[in-house]
């Protein structure tokens, strides 16, 4: 892993740890701060070593063998070979909402996950385009930062919800400085926005890069563009409602569109702009669509 990635990963962990500790202090003073710091250390450790298992468990994703999904495995193996990385494990998510994501701390410990809905609506070329995009995230080593951000942002949301509960049900110490109560209310409002902005910062530019790299790996930018249009349309009609919004930036298209996100804080670039860029890449490759 390059020095730049180590630095980015360290800064991300430090910032999110600080956010967790700050919220912990506002909830429970010094004791809350110590508990939050302990939780942060625990989450940092597990988000690095077991991030893939954590994210897969959130979506009940199941690792499938070559016997269970031979065609899918063949596609993943071919594209991984073309990208020059080890073949990732393959998982299927039991939801009809079409989407895909990659996770894992390194190319040697990566997983490509696709939903049942994706397998239903895409043809083979489109599926290759999507998987090439996800393999690009693995090749570019985006998956480590994406997954750590998802796990720690999820922890922040749990703490924020606990803080909200403590205010609503009177668990917060009323004898403490009223300024802390105001600060806690502000933290409840602003912490989720901060977590979303972090996801936005690490996601948008990397999505463009994964589109470009994936198009070159598969040689089918037109197929990826077609897949993005299909996924976008399906997500607008039926957004994912049972997942964890902290993982939105990990998917090829934000699956929570229309639920709690607005375009200003979208974790992904507009699909129309991504398709336009893919058109330019296709023209450079001598492909017109």
Curated annotation (Swiss-Prot):
By its UniProt entry, which CDD domains does this protein fall under? M48B_HtpX_like
Give the UniProt subcellular location, in the record's own words: Cell membrane
Where is the catalytic site? Answer: 134
Q: What is its EC number?
A: 3.4.24.-
**Record bears the keyword Cell membrane:** yes
* Domain of life of the organism encoding this protein: Archaea
What biological processes does GO assign it?
Answer: proteolysis
The free-text note explaining how the cofactor binds reads: Binds 1 zinc ion per subunit.
Q: Which co-factors does it depend on?
A: Zn(2+)
Keywords, A to Z, come to: Cell membrane, Hydrolase, Membrane, Metal-binding, Metalloprotease, Protease, Transmembrane, Transmembrane helix, Zinc
Q: Which residues cross the membrane?
A: 5-27, 40-60, 143-163, 181-201
Query: What GO cellular component is one of the record's annotations?
Result: plasma membrane
Gene Ontology MF terms in the entry: metalloendopeptidase activity; zinc ion binding
What membrane topology does the annotation report for this chain? Multi-pass membrane protein
Does the entry feature the keyword Hydrolase, yes or no? Answer: yes
Enzyme class comes to hydrolase
- Which positions in this protein are listed as binding Zn(2+)? 133, 137, 207
- PANTHER family recorded for this chain? PROTEASE HTPX, PROTEASE HTPX HOMOLOG
Annotated family? Belongs to the peptidase M48B family.
Q: Please identify the protein, giving its name as recorded.
A: Protease HtpX homolog
Natural source organism: Pyrococcus furiosus (strain ATCC 43587 / DSM 3638 / JCM 8422 / Vc1)
């Amino acid at each position: 892993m390059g020095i730049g990635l180590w630095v980015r990963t360290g800064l991300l962990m430090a910032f999110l740890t600080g956010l967790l500790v700050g919220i912990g202090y506002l909830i429970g003073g010094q004791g809350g701060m110590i508990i939050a710091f302990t939780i942060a250390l625990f989450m940092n450790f597990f988000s690095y070593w077991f991030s893939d298992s954590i994210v897969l468990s959130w979506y009940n994703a199941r690792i499938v063998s070559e016997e269970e999904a031979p065609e899918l495995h063949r596609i993943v193996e071919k594209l991984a070979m073309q990208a020059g990385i080890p073949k990732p494990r393959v998982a299927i998510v039991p939801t009809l909402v079409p989407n895909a994501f990659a996770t894992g701390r390194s190319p040697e410990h990566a997983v490509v996950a696709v939903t049942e809905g994706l397998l239903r609506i895409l043809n083979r070329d489109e599926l290759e385009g999507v998987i090439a995009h996800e393999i690009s995230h693995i090749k570019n080593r985006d998956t480590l930062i994406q997954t750590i951000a998802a796990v720690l942002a999820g922890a922040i949301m749990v703490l924020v919800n606990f803080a909200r509960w403590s205010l609503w049900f009177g668990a917060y110490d009323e004898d403490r400085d009223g300024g802390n109560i105001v600060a806690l209310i502000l933290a409840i409002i602003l912490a989720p926005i901060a977590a979303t902005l972090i996801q936005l910062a690490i996601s948008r530019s990397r999505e463009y890069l994964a589109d470009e790299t994936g198009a070159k790996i598969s040689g089918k930018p037109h197929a990826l563009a077609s897949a993005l249009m299909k996924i976008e349309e399906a997500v607008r009609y039926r957004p994912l409602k049972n997942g964890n919004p902290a993982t939105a930036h990990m998917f090829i298209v934000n699956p929570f569109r229309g639920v709690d996100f607005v375009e200003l804080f979208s974790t992904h670039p507009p699909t129309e702009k991504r398709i336009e860029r893919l058109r330019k890449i296709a023209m450079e490759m001598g492909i017109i669509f």
